[in-house]
């Protein structure tokens, strides 16, 4: 639909919108940044040649407009309380703001729109939705001190993210439920420290990029494609599933490091109940990742072998292998660097 210059323009405006939200010192300014971000992201989603992407952009627009309306209304209520001394329950208003931000980020119990919308996106748009579009809402959530609502959202997110991915055959929905599960971990890290949240978000974004980069190159959208592709390239198949396990947080891969930090801090804060549920949910996600890996290595389907004529160029291959190296051995390298310096 757009040429590259248009995409660059919309991506730049989207980044500016997020920066306005993060640097704003008022809720009204934060709302304005979120709206700029929304209006620049929707043109990136829509595609005249793909009806599913157009439907996904409409779903995203309606959901985000609902959240933005609630956020604006709540911000006005807070301004009335602060400036006109009206008797407005501030904790109730903050709870409404928190709910609107959880809806914007796609956290449970406001996750209903997220997996269905992911199904209609290209991999690059899906990556932006799973990573960049979560920065502004999560930063605003960190300003609110409503622990009980955040605790409920964390528990529901990790459980729904784990159970929802069990019977999925679509890779995009699988990544969506994985994102909801990781969002629960990120929200729990927000309860402890903003720096731990930033570390977790960075590693999650990197691991998601490695997987979506591979899916985008080979146009992989369903599990049966994983079984039938890479029949002649065991190395690519092996590295792909190692990245899956790293994203799931299996030690000793890189994805275990942010979970390790969160587990350590939650233990120090005596949050044992929440931590137990989070770790159990992670075991469920690792179960379906391992099940996919086992099936893909044990079973080969040869119907679609003609599709393997599409070759991966050397630049993409080298880039993917470098990122995979850090994904698999990153924890060892960071530990070595820590002990040396």
Curated annotation (Swiss-Prot):
Catalytic activity of the protein: a ubiquinone + NADH + 5 H(+)(in) = a ubiquinol + NAD(+) + 4 H(+)(out)
According to the record, the segments passing through the membrane are 8-28, 60-80, 95-115, 121-141, 146-166, 195-215, 238-258, 273-293, 321-341
List the Gene Ontology MF annotations in alphabetical order.
NADH dehydrogenase (ubiquinone) activity
A Pfam entry, by short name: Proton_antipo_M
Consequence recorded when altering residue 148 to F:
In strain: Zimbabwe 53
Where located?
Answer: Mitochondrion inner membrane
* Alphabetical list of InterPro entries matching this protein: Complex_I_Subunit_2 (IPR050175), NADH_DH_su2_C (IPR010933), NADH_UbQ_OxRdtase_chain2 (IPR003917), ND/Mrp_TM (IPR001750)
UniProt main location, coarse? mitochondrion
Q: Which GO terms describe its cellular component?
A: mitochondrial inner membrane; respiratory chain complex I
Task: Tell me, in a sentence or two, what this protein's role is.
Answer: Core subunit of the mitochondrial membrane respiratory chain NADH dehydrogenase (Complex I) that is believed to belong to the minimal assembly required for catalysis. Complex I functions in the transfer of electrons from NADH to the respiratory chain. The immediate electron acceptor for the enzyme is believed to be ubiquinone.
- The identity of this protein, by name, is NADH-ubiquinone oxidoreductase chain 2
């Amino acid at each position: 639909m757009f040429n590259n210059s248009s995409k660059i323009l919309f991506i730049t405006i989207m980044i500016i919108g997020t920066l306005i939200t993060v640097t704003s010192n008022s809720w009204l300014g934060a709302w304005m940044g979120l709206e700029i971000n929304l209006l620049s992201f929707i043109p990136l989603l829509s595609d005249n040649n793909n009806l599913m992407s157009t439907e996904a952009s409409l779903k995203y627009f309606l959901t985000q407009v609902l959240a933005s309306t609630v956020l604006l209304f709540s911000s006005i209520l807070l301004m009335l309380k602060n400036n006109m001394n009206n008797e407005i329950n501030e904790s109730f208003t903050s709870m409404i703001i928190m709910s609107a931000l959880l809806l914007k980020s796609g956290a449970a119990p406001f996750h209903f729109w997220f997996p269905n919308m992911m199904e209609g996106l290209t991999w690059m748009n899906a990556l932006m939705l799973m990573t960049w579009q979560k920065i502004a809402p999560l930063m605003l959530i960190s300003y609110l001190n409503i622990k009980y609502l955040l605790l409920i959202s964390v528990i529901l997110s990790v459980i729904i993210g784990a159970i929802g991915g069990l019977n999925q055959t679509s890779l995009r929905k699988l990544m969506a439920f994985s994102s909801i599960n990781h969002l629960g971990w990120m929200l729990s890290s927000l309860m402890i420290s903003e720096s731990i949240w930033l570390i977790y978000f960075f590693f999650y974004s990197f691991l998601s990029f490695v997987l979506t980069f591979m899916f985008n190159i080979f146009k992989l959208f369903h599990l049966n494609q994983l079984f039938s592709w890479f029949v002649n390239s065991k190395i690519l198949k092996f590295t792909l599933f190692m990245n899956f396990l790293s994203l799931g947080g299996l030690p000793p891969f890189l994805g275990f490091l942010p979970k390790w930090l969160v587990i350590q801090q939650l233990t120090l804060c005596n949050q044992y109940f929440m931590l137990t549920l989070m770790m159990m949910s992670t075991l469920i996600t690792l179960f379906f990742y391992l099940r996919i890996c086992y099936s893909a290595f044990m079973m080969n389907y040869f119907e679609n072998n003609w599709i393997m004529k599409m070759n991966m160029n050397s630049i993409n291959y080298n880039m993917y292998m470098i990122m995979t190296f850090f994904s698999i051995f990153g924890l060892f390298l960071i530990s070595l660097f820590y002990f040396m310096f």
